[in-house]
């Protein structure tokens, strides 16, 4: 251990202790000068003298860091201690009188570490025994808090107040259980009956004693439930949960997820007793909570480090713990542990499966042993009573070997092609040989079985006569019961014996008339050659076809043929199995002579008979032969014909009609009843209430305003027509003026050319120069620009007024025609506008 030392008061900096610092360890037997020891600080980081060096401050004379010397509680405790120390000093050195003991006004509660322990107390606390570390020292990795928790991991620990209440409760419970007074003390001199005495014993409840562990468990459940459901109880005590809300935690099995250990404690016992205990503990817990002002009964440590100035924070870190980085070696070790865990789990699963397999094998062997013993007992019973006999099933149960029974060979009916004579003979020979071998094998097996039975069951029968008489009596009684049952059911039809109910014949069958109705003597006739009876006589019906044509339909008679020997060819099986429905060829058409009938009967082969049979089944609608879409014999070839004798249709008809089936055949009056109810409801219905808010009526049109509006529209239309007419006139005038101006220019040019030619002819003999001087080509204008003179003549300036023009007669005529057309168009447009206005006025008035 590091030697305790005095507080260093020097101002020099003490070297911090790191993982590389060498320390001196003193033992109890060593003599150490405590005044020479120094107090050092542990440095978690070797390089902490850098940016965090200001946090590692020197420890002063008070034993705390210099940064915490100004803490309020520490200063108050130091001041109180200094006052106490000053008051204990004597007033003078020579005075012997002791000063009165003074108490600290404020102190920090710390355990008293002053003084030395006596040898007797030390020997009791620290015995001189050698510690031996066990081989299973490390068992689990739970923390101290987890290890010290109670049932279910709940961390409630009872204090002195809880202990006093629990002792009082248990003492009262034990005292109340022993206060049962006797009959003599109660003054009852009469004797009590046994039933009353038992009743009194049953009415006395068992004493309810609560153990400390059970008390801590109940209080822990109350605390955890309140912490989860009422975390703000310290602000409002009305949120305290009642006992009815917590009773289900004790009267019913508690959920493992509610407990911190996720395991239900095995020591709980009966739930009813647990609920009684919780009901008695609840008032005490409630009072403790109210005393704590809704806070937890056990004070909670403050681990919140957000506020550095809070002095009540427990286990504060002096230095910021550095974040440790994950290294490759750590990952490797983790991977190795994971691999080891996977291998151990695989080995455990494999061992578990092997154990399961061996258990199944054991159960299988036990079952086989029981089966063998049952067979042996059954065999002994048969051997002791040989009169009981032995069947093939019983022999199979005893020996375990099934009896080989050859299957019955039935020729296949799927073949349609008859075999030839050579193929048929070879097939019959092979089948005969095979049957002979199977018969010989079966005979040998029967002989061997009879020999074994005669060897095992040989000797005289040991069955007593009483057993035989009893068997005969049982057989006679059974026969009498069957006869009596038959007499009772004589007038009843058993639906189990005949479950099939044939369908009623169709209307087409009723329309056919048999020849027996016309000639009753033919009903007793038979076939003269074979003597076969007639099953279905020949019948006819008359029907009217399309176009009013009368048609006669007939059905030939069907005879009951005799069944001969079993055929050898598969093609002969349909005729041999169903002879009654295979009509002969002579029955399908009208014979012409007797010789023809005999020849047809002789020439008809089994193949032809099978073909006729297939055709009959295919097209016979009454027998269900025509099945599918488009197989009908009527005009509607697309109708679907089904087989009424098929299993999915016949299963609805094999039982008798019930009352519910008859109800389905009646008409449904639901729609009529519903309609009648609706009419009655409409007749009795009250008129709808008048609405509170009604829509205001539309305003009536004012005829004066309409007339004024119509007149204004007419005036606007007339004004638009006048403007359009004036526009047309102006356009016509402009066109006429342009034409007149063009004609005037053309005439002026023609006159100028004529005058120029005349002058040239008159003065043709003159000098050219004089001619040029006398008649210049251009006249100078005031602005200095010479005006052109076409053909030696100066052009006149254009006239701006219309009055200066004088139009020729043809231009005047053309202008008049254009103006007349414009007036006609304007008058026509005005007439159309007036008609539209009149129609609009009529529609608005309507």
From Swiss-Prot:
Keywords: Cell cycle, Coiled coil, DNA damage, DNA repair, Nucleus, Transcription, Transcription regulation
Compositional bias annotation for Pro residues: 686-702
Biased composition (Low complexity): 759-773
Pfam families according to UniProt: EPL1 (PF10513)
UniProt key word Acyltransferase: no
Gene Ontology cellular-component terms listed: NuA4 histone acetyltransferase complex; nucleus
Compositionally biased residues, Polar residues: 411-426, 774-796
Coiled coil: 434-490
A biological-process GO annotation: DNA repair
Function comment: Component of the NuA4 histone acetyltransferase complex which is involved in transcriptional activation of selected genes principally by acetylation of nucleosomal histone H4 and H2A. The NuA4 complex is also involved in DNA repair. Involved in gene silencing by neighboring heterochromatin, blockage of the silencing spreading along the chromosome, and required for cell cycle progression through G2/M.
Assembly with partners or alone: Component of the NuA4 histone acetyltransferase complex.
Similarity field: Belongs to the enhancer of polycomb family.
PANTHER family associated with the record: ENHANCER OF POLYCOMB (PTHR14898)
Protein name per Swiss-Prot or TrEMBL: Enhancer of polycomb-like protein 1
Species annotation: Cryptococcus neoformans var. neoformans serotype D (strain B-3501A)
UniProt lineage: Eukaryota, Fungi, Dikarya, Basidiomycota, Agaricomycotina
Gene name of this polypeptide: EPL1
